[in-house]
């Protein structure tokens, strides 16, 4: 039996689970009931389940194959977002202010479907398949924390995962090699000037003016310090300074993010930003410091894993379902798994204008065409089977 033969059989199963999870969202590091539900369903299939009992969130399922061999992990993230849903569907979130607005409900359903398929094809599995249901992806720290849970990560030899993607038409899948999602880092800039009277600016060092100059000068990091052939996004998302209408503030704080694909350029990018921040402030008689926090590295598919994934998509769904898609600037903590293990991260098309599945991820109207999710389940299952068969 081939995974493609099970797509229709589990179509409703996967769709129903996606809608169940959509109705019952839980935020990052709060996925207690979600974890219990997943564990119960996997155990009902006969999957070996290991829950992170210390935290009560996240679990590893293990499917032991009919023959000995290596181990591969299939991963799904399980957290929702603090978003008030504005959809009117009958599976709308039942929890006020919480919503699966990024598609992780679909990821869980896809992996449950893959588990069902794998359990019915155990004779084809030459090794072990680990099912990694990871909490807290939205924090950026979910994967590093989950890697520390037990010894599952040490035991696997490769990993595969994916993200439903609203910019890709439903039914298409993209698995190209190389950078697929950007590194995501947080920057905080603290400016210190000199507070003064609003009528006497010459006796003060205006932190707002200094901050404004820093923001403007930072634009040259991208336009004049980075090659036009490289990709860097530098965004300042907030500025906080002052509280009175007639007082020149002496302090300001700014927050932002940088996104990039080449990890070898990270140090250069950070130092370029630091130089602009510090010297701009100095030119105005102020001081400024840069705090840099690395959230996730870039998600980079290795060539061999992507080549296998392309073959699997064509073999399972047909050549017309394999799509090419440009890399994207959002970050994904799946990247942490790829630091030490070979793997591939797929984009799974869910866009369908006929059902208004066109709103962007994190939007309060986000939705997906979930009729195509069982096809993704088949790709997950078949990738695991074929990877194990080719790496005896």
Where are these regions (language model features)?
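Metal-dependent amide/peptide-bond hydrolase catalytic core
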Residues: 212-392
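A structural signal for isolated positions on well-ordered beta-strands in alpha/beta enzyme cores
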Residues: 50, 130-132, 289
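Divalent metal-coordination and catalytic microenvironments
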Residues: 21, 61, 74, 104, ...
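Non-cysteine beta-strand/loop elements that form the S-adenosyl-L-methionine
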Residues: 73-75, 84, 187, 345-350
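Acidic/His- and Gly-rich active-site-bordering loop/insert found
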Residues: 1-100, 109-125
């Amino acid at each position: 039996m081939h995974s493609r033969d099970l797509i229709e059989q589990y179509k409703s199963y996967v769709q129903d689970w996606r809608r169940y999870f959509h109705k019952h969202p839980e935020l990052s590091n709060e996925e207690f009931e979600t974890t219990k539900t997943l564990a119960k369903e996997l155990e009902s299939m006969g999957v070996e389940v290991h829950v992170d009992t210390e935290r009560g969130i996240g679990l590893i399922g293990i499917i032991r194959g009919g023959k000995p061999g290596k181990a591969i992990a299939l991963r799904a993230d399980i957290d929702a977002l603090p978003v008030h849903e504005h959809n009117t569907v009958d599976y709308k979130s039942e929890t006020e202010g919480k919503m699966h607005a990024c598609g992780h409900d679909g990821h869980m359903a896809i992996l449950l479907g893959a588990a069902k398929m794998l359990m019915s094809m155990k004779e084809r599995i030459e090794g072990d398949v680990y099912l990694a249901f990871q909490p807290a992806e939205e924090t950026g720290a979910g994967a590093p924390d989950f890697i520390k849970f037990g010894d599952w990560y040490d035991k696997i030899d490769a990993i595969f995962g994916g993200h439903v993607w609203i910019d890709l038409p439903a039914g298409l899948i993209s698995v190209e090699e190389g950078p697929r999602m950007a590194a995501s880092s947080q920057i905080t800039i603290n400016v210190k000037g000199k507070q003064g009277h609003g009528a006497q600016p010459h006796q003060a060092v205006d932190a707002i003016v200094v901050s404004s100059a820093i923001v403007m000068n930072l634009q040259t990091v991208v336009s004049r310090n980075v090659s036009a052939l490289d990709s860097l996004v530098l965004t300042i998302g907030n500025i906080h300074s002052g509280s009175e209408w007639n007082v020149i503030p002496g302090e300001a704080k700014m927050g932002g993010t940088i996104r990039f694909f080449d990890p070898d350029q990270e140090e250069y990018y950070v130092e370029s930003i630091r130089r602009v921040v510090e010297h701009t402030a100095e030119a105005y008689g102020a001081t400024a410091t840069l705090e840099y926090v690395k959230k996730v590295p870039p998600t980079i598919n290795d060539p061999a894993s992507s080549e296998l994934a392309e073959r699997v998509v064509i073999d399972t769904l047909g050549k017309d379902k394999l799509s090419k898609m440009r890399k994207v600037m959002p970050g994904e903590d799946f990247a942490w798994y790829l630091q030490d293990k070979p793997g591939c991260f797929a984009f799974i098309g869910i866009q369908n204008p006929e059902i208004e599945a066109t709103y962007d991820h994190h939007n309060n109207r986000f939705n997906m065409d979930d009729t195509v999710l069982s096809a993704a389940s088949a790709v997950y299952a078949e990738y695991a089977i074929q990877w194990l068969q080719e790496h005896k």
